[in-house]
Regions:
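Sec-dependent signal peptide recognition
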Residues: 1-7
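N-terminal signal peptide c-region/cleavage motif recognized by signal peptidases
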Residues: 9, 14-16
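Electrostatic cytochrome c docking/interface patches
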Residues: 23-62, 73-77, 139
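The canonical Cys-X-X-Cys-His
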Residues: 61-73, 84-94, 151, 155
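Short Cys/His-rich "knuckle" micro-motifs
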Residues: 76-81, 97-101
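Short Fe-S-cluster ligation motifs
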Residues: 100-135
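C-terminal capping alpha-helices of c-type cytochrome domains
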Residues: 125-159
Length: 159
């Protein structure tokens, strides 16, 4: 995809941290999805839910999903550094293979669903930052605009 197209689509939100709505982000992702796929017919909550729960192999061979960190129910908060979330879910594998060197803090993962956290998907810079980090960890690539739009569409259906 051409960088100029991406720049144009996100020109609505020229500065980091400027407010947006989930619907505005979806419109931008729809424009990008349409550029990369002329047969794009809209986002799917079903595909978004499937993507959220799909397991992906990470560096150590284990399988993680979005739900590994963000909770099986995205309307609930979750705390890192407990038995259900392995360190590698957030940190990847340390170079020395030793997680003992990583400080153990109880990082709070706020609810991902906008119905439980009204600030979700209202800052396009923050949204892109975390999609880039999390998709890179799980998929070893950027998420596509279709994948991002599908996940946000599904999360918007949760009441």
């Amino acid at each position: 995809m051409k960088p100029a197209i991406l720049l144009l689509v996100f020109a609505l939100w020229a500065s980091p941290g400027q407010g947006a709505t989930p619907e505005e982000l979806l419109s931008a992702y729809a424009a990008l999805a349409g550029q990369s796929d002329p047969h794009f017919a809209g986002f799917s909550a079903d595909r978004g839910r499937a993507f959220y729960f799909s397991g992906y192999r990470v560096e150590d061979g284990s399988e993680l999903s979005c739900a590994s960190c963000h909770h099986e129910d995205p309307r609930r908060e979750q705390f890192a550094h407990h038995d259900k979330i392995p360190c590698r879910a957030c940190h990847g594998m340390p170079d020395n293979g030793n997680f003992e060197d990583i400080p153990k803090i109880r990082r709070q993962f706020l609810p991902l669903a906008p119905s439980a956290n009204s600030r979700r998907f209202t800052d396009e810079w923050f949204v892109e930052k975390w999609f880039r980090k999390n998709c890179g960890l799980l998929l070893k690539r950027d998420c596509t605009p279709l994948e991002k739009g599908d996940v946000i569409t599904w999360l918007l259906t949760l009441k």
